From Swiss-Prot:
Residues 622-631 have a biased composition (Acidic residues). Gene3D superfamilies: 1.20.1270.10, 3.30.420.40, Actin, Chain A, domain 4 (3.90.640.10), Substrate Binding Domain Of DNAk, Chain A, domain 1 (2.60.34.10). The keyword Nucleotide-binding applies. It comes from the Bacteria. This is Chaperone protein DnaK. Belongs to the heat shock protein 70 family. Keywords: ATP-binding, Chaperone, Nucleotide-binding, Phosphoprotein, Stress response. One of its GO terms (molecular function) is ATP binding.
Amino acid sequence: MSKVLGIDLGTTNSCMAIYEGKEAKVIPNKEGKNTTPSVVAFTDKGEVLVGDPAKRQMITNPKRTIYSVKRIMGMMCNEEKAQEAKKRLPYNIVDRNGACAVDVDGKVYTPQEISAKILMKLKEDAEAYLGQEITEAVITVPAYFNDAQRKATKEAGQIAGLNVLRIINEPTAAALAYGLDKKEAEKIVVYDLGGGTFDVTILETGDNVVEVLATGGDAFLGGDDFDNRIIDWLVDEFKKETGIDLKSDIMALQRLKEAAENAKKELSSAMETEINLPFITADQSGPKHLVKKLTRAKFESLIEDLVEKTITIANNVLKDSGLSKDEVNEVVLVGGSTRIPLVQQKVKEFFGKEPNKSVNPDEVVAVGAAIQGAVIKGDVKDVLLLDVTPLSLGIETLGGVMTKIIEKGTTIPVKKSQIFSTAEDNQPAVTIHVLQGEREMAKDNKSLGQFTLEGIPPAPRGVPQIEVTFDIDANGILTVSAKDKATGKEQKITVTGTSGLSEEEIQRMIQDAEAHKEEDRKRKELVETRNQADALAYQTEKSLKEVGNAISADERAQIEAALNDLKNVLKDENATKEQIEAKVQALTQVSHKLAEAMYKKEQGQTGGTEQGGTEQKKSGGDDDVIDAEVE
C-alpha cells in the first residue's frame, strides 16, 4: 500500500514524514537532513536548484533565487503586504492577472509553481528513501491562511504530481503529533512561530479526539521579520559610519540577510555575536568592511514589539476559547523561531507556566501531517480531528456591508445557507461577492471572488428569494452556490478568487513540471556519463604508465588516439551523452589488451601468496572475498 507523505511546506524550511509501523517518522532528504530550505534557484545555464544547493548561491545569484515565496502565496499584488514583500525580497515580484508572481529572466512563475518545485524535491527524495512511488500527500498551512492561500497550496501539490488528500492547519497537526497518545483530556495551546507566519491555536485533546477551540494568528509575522530588524539596524549603523546606504545594493543585502539569520540563531545560546562582512561595498577611498557586535539585549530590543504582538494575538485567542490561563494544561512551542529566549520568556510570563519543549519544533508539524494521512487511509483508527475556520465568511450586501454566513471558529466541514433578495425592482441578476474577514464593511475584508446568478424573473425589490449556501470542506476550502427559489436556477463556484488558477492553467503547469523533471533526469544522466568517462580516461592513462610497454606500439597508438578523442569530447561543454558514450565505447574496445596486461601484472603481484590462498580456499575462509575481487 502506498504511503501518504506528510509535508510541512514552510516559509524558510520544509519537512516531510510518513506513518509506518504504528508511528510517524521524519524522512531525511537526499542530503541527509531532516529539513530542506524552501529555496528555488535558476542558474544562468537554465538548471533548477532546490533546497541547500539553491540556498548556497543566494548571495551570488540574488535575482534568480526565490525564497519565502509562501509570503506571497494566494496574494493579490495590490495588497499592502505584497507591496512590503516587493520592497524586501531581491527577486522580481510582478502582477499576473492581479495576483503576485515571480519574474525570472522574463519567464513568469506563480508562487504555486515555485512551491511545486520544493514539493517535487521532497516527493523524489522520499521515493528514493522509501524505494516506492509516492502519489498522495497531506500538506500543512498556517491556521490563519485564508481561502485563496489554502487553495494555492493545494494547487502547488497538484502541479508537483501529488494528490493532496487534505490541507491541515499547522498547529492542529502539531497537536495531533503531541496529543495522540494522551488518554487524559488536556487543553493545550500550540504557539507556532515559524519563518514567515505566526499562529496560536487552543485545542482539547484526549481519548483520540483533537478538537480546536479557537485559533488566530498573523500570516506575515515570523523569523523573516526578526532578520529584517537586524538588517535594518546594520544598514543604519553602516550608513552612520560611512555615509553609504546598502539598501540599493542587492548583493550586499543578501550577505546581510545571511549574516542576520546566523546572528539570530547564535544569540539563542550566546549572549553576544560578531557580524563580520569584509568587502561589503566600496567607494572612492577603497573597499569597506562591516564589523559589528550584536548583543542578545540589543537583538531583543529590536524585536520586542513583534514578540509582544504574538502575545496580544494569544490573549485574543484565549478569550475566544472561553478558557482562563489556569485551565490551560500545556503550552507547546512549534516553529524554529520559538528557540529565541525572549519568545520563550514572554510565553512563560503570559501563560504563567514553563512552555513544553518536548517536541522538535522543526519536525512536529510534518509528523502530525503524516498521522493525519494515516487517519484518512484508515491506518490509524478512531481518531477524530475537529478543526475550525479561522476567519468569518460572508457576502457583500446593500450599502457595502459584509454579511457573515459562517462565523470564525465554526467547526469544519460545515454547510450554511441564508436567504437574500434583490435591491431593485425587476432586477434580472444578482452578483454574489464572497468575502473573508472580521470587518463590518466589505471593502475592509479579503475578497475571495464573485459570480453572477442570472435569469431572475421580473419582480418588485425584496420579493425574489435567493438562497446563498456556503460549504467548507475538511481542507477549509470554500464552495459557494446561489439559487433562485422560484425558478430553481442555480449558480455554483468553488471560490478561486482572482489569485487562483484555472483548471487549464494547473494542467499546463503539471505538464511543465513533468517536462522539467525529464530535463533534470537527462542532465543528471549526462553528469554521470561524464564522471564515468573521466574515471575511464584517468584509469587508462594510469595503466599506460604502468604496463604500456607490455603491448605493441601499434596497440598503444590506437589507445592513445582513442584516449585523446575522449579527453577532447569531455572538454566540450556542449557534448551530448551519446557523443561521450561513443568515445567511451571506442576507447574500451581498443584497450582490452591493456586491461589484460594490467590483470596479469596484478596476478603476478599476488602470486607470492598463491599457496596460502589455496590453503584458505580449502578451509573455505576467503572463497567469497576472492570472487568479489575478480568481479
